[in-house]
Amino acid sequence: MALDTGASYTMIPWETAEALGLQPEISTKKANMITASGIEKVPVVTVDSIRTFGKLVNNVEVIVHDLPPKSHVDGLLGLSFLKHFKLTVDFRNGYLEIE
């Protein structure tokens, strides 16, 4: 997953959502997502938990959408996960800290 501090939601691909049994195709909650081709309404589902960077968050709302294969990214870690932590990005020294 790529870190995206400009994304309101964490994003997972359809294949992952379906493998987790989340049934995005019947989700009644939708979010607007800006893509290269315009604004799309995408399903919002709740993931039981996400663990990354040694941090765990339960009941995370995520959007379900596939990124282009050439992006080589399988999802985005957005604010629905990151808002639970203090995030420090130090570009000059090349490090990221989540606490």
Predicted regions: what is each one?
Residues 1-99:
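Pepsin/retropepsin-fold aspartyl endopeptidases
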